[in-house]
Structures are given as C-alpha cells and as structure tokens.
Amino acid sequence: MIGDGMGPQQVGLLTHYAKLAANSTVPDRTTAIEHVLNEGVVGVVMNQPHGVLVADSAAAATQLATGQYAGSEMIGANYRGEQVENIVEVAHRIGKSAGLVTDTRITHATPAGFAAHEANRESENEIAVDMVDERVDVLLGGGLRNWVPDAVNDPESTAYAALMQLTGGAYPATSRREDNRNLLLEVRGDYQLAFDRVALARISSGRVLGIFADSELADALEDRASLEDPKRTEPTHVEMTAKALELLNQNPTGFFLMVEGGQIDWAGHNNDAGALLHEMLQFDDAVRTVYEWVKNRDDTLLLVTGDHETGSFGFSYAGRPIPPATRLEGGLFRDVPFAPNFNYAPPQLLDQIHAQSKSYFTMLNEYDSLPPTEQTPERLVEIVNGASAFKITRDEAAQVLTRAKNRNYVEGHPYMNTPTVPRIRDFESFYVYGENLRMNLLGRVVAEEQHVTWGAGTHSSTPVIIGAYGPREVIGGFGGMLHSTDVGQRMIEAISASRPATATAAQPTP
C-alpha cells in the first residue's frame, strides 16, 4: 500500500492525532500503520531516481514496481529508457491476478508505474491503453476522461448521450483523448464495468474496471461529509479495497494488489494540514482493511510505505506566544517555575486541525465559482472561516489573492505557463503549480496558529518508512536501510516464490 507523498512526518501527524488528540477518532488510539510497524519489520527507504536527488511519483512507482532505477517522470522504463517488466506483468506471467486501486485517476503516475510503459507520465491516454493491453484484473479509481472518445466533449453529441446511458449518468463526463477510441466499449467483453458504488457492490467475480469520477475521486473531507448520504455514488477507499481483495482472492494461485492513497500527496502540495490529516486517516482506514484481512493468514505479505515525501511538512516550536510559567509538584521545581523559553505546540492543535471541514482546494473552487464582482478578500474570509478553526483576516485574505510576475514562467509548459501567479515571497522555485499557489499562501497565513511549517510546494528527498507484515521468512528482507529498487526486487522475489505468496503494496503519489 502506498501513501503518495507520505513521509515520516505525515505518519507522525497521523500518530500524534491518534494518540494525543482529545477527540481522536482512531480505534483504541492505535493506527493500522502502527500495527503493521509494531508487529512486522520496519525499514527506511531512499527513493531517488537515477541522476537526481528528488523523486517524482512516476519514477518512484516505476522503481517500486520493477526493482530498477528509473529516470524522472518515466513510466515502466529504466533510466536508459528501456522498457522493463513490472510486478503486475510478473504476477500475470506466473498465473497470479493483479489489481490497482487509487483515489486519483487510474492512469495517474503511481498506478501507471505498476502497469504501463510510457516515456512520460503525462501520456495518460496511452497509459489507459497499456492497462487494457495488460488486462489488469481489477482497476478501481477515477479518470474516465482518458478512456472515452473526444466526441464526448460535446454534451449535445450522440457520443455523450451513449456514454451517459452506459454509465447511468453517474457523473458528468469529459474527454482528454484526441481520438475516437472508446476504451470502455473495447473492454466490455472482457471486463465488468462499474461507475458507482452500487454497481461495484454487485460484482462478485471476474475482471472489473470501476471508474467513479471524470478525474480524481472526492477528497477525504468530501468523503467524510457524504459518507451517510444514501445518494452517495462514489465508493470509499475502504469499499474499493475490500472489493479488490474479494475479487482477487478468488485466484487460488495468488495475487498482487497495489492500493494508493494518492491525495495525501495533493494535500502536501497544497500545504493543507487539515486535508493532510484527513487523507492520512482515510488511507489508514484502507490499511486497516487489508491488515485485518491479512493478520490471520500465513500466505500474504502486506507492505505499507510512501513513494516520497511532499511539502517538507512538520510541526515546529515558535517564539510566540510564550506560554505562561506554571508550578510543578516535583521537588526539582519546588523553588522555580516551569517556564520553557519557547512555545512547543500544544496537542489541542490536533483537534483544531481535524475540525477543518473543506480542503483548501474546495475552498478556492468555491471562491472561483463566485461572480467576478464578488471575488473579494471579504468573500474569501467567509469561505475559509466557515470551514476552518483557524480564522483569517481580510488583510491575510488579500495576501492570498495578491499576484506577481511568474519567475518560473516557461511558454507552453504544462504547469508554469502563466505570466503572473499568486505571490510567493521566498523559495519561489519550489512553488510551481500556478493558481494552486493560493493554497500554499493560505497554508502560510494560518501556519503560525497551527505551529505547522512547510518547506515547499513540491517533493522533498526525505527517506520514507516501510512496514512489512506477514510470514517471518519473507518480511526480514524489508528491514534496514533500503532503496526503493531494493523494495521492488524483494517484492518480485516474494511473489515469484514457489510458496503461494501475495504481495500487497501501498504507496504515495507525487
């Protein structure tokens, strides 16, 4: 299982909340990730691709899936550009089944690294074709736009009407394809198709392609808000994971399953601590589902790791406000007060961070949907303060909305192609995602109250943690200091062993 962007700091945030928050929602205050780490073997994983220090999700996933060093942004290739066999292909070659589950697009970098071969991660239309050609047994996530023909972009077209009939109108659709291939129709004879959670629940055997959104699935905060809604159409992470286990386990030879918590990464990119905590909680729920399934078996290997860390996140101590001096009962403090020189971040912050009800992404989408005359600092204050325990002022909202020349501007670049961007006053080179920089600025505005610091809007080189849980003779190889290629090689060795062994890998995305 892969928490995309899940470094040790993100695991620390989750664990702090579980253990120290007064209103922790974690069962017995013990996360599933903690169970895996305590009951299995723990390793530390370097993740740099060939020739660089920092990994993107495509190279990171490719290294985990193949056991070979990749180049940045490559999918399913080694650093020389040669197509290399991935663990899904290994599983199929030896008669096992394979599945991929994500809360992002099925064609996004992390799942792509396990089942496709393309020169660049941006080739999502081609990645979808690769997945069809590989006949991955279970594919669950979002991203319909890469599977349906270009004609779908006209909502008045017969193509759009036919698609709505096929999907039951589960959600509005667009297309990013530049041809008229409808991959859904191409696979319909080989796969059962599901576009909502009810249809997914009905499937009890066989291959399944479940696509539940035009792009990514709802984020963890949206999921929490809609969980009890009888009209909810999207399956949860837990529901997708449980269904994948149910279907793949029907192969007596065994299976490989990769489950990604992809929006951990996105919360890190956006410097959104509240969303990050909820994404970690949601991913941990999926880990718990697999842990409970695995714990009474002797034939299954569960790996929980990150592909890289995102945002250089952390709690930090601060120079203000300095807490008042207090008296302690211990004899050492009989004549002196307990008076730390700095504010070391009280645990009450954890419940306040958890109280956030919308991600920064949702907040800014609401702001952008206002009529232009209403897109004012005052309205941004209303939106943010209505969804967060950390309130902002009009002046702070104005800071979030202030623009400046884009010093990273590159004409035609997929991300850095706008002449102006929200104004970042330092480390501009590490904030590259255009209008999303407003979210980074919002994270900075509340940082002092949260005691949260962010080092970037991109990835860091921080090593990640891996927890291996399962048969003792298998998990030992995942302890110690490793590189992600070591993890990939040992996963392939484990699934290729003569003893029926299942590898379940979990990771983060860039």
Question: What role is predicted for each listed range?
Answer:
Residues T15, Q68-A70, T104:
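Short glycine-rich, polar/acidic loop-and-turn segments at beta strand-coil junctions
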Residues M1-G3:
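Short hydrophobic beta-strand that contains or immediately precedes a catalytic carboxylate
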Residues V88-E89, R93-A112, R499:
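Glycine-rich phosphate/pyrophosphate-binding loops
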Residues G71-M74, K96-V101, L139:
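Short secondary-structure capping/junction motifs at helix and strand boundaries
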Residues A77-E85, E122:
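Glycine-rich anion/phosphate-binding loops
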Residues M6-G12, H16-T62, H108-P508:
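A post-motif C-terminal structural segment
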Residues V52, D56-Y79:
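A glycine- and small-residue-enriched flexible loop/hinge segment at structural boundaries
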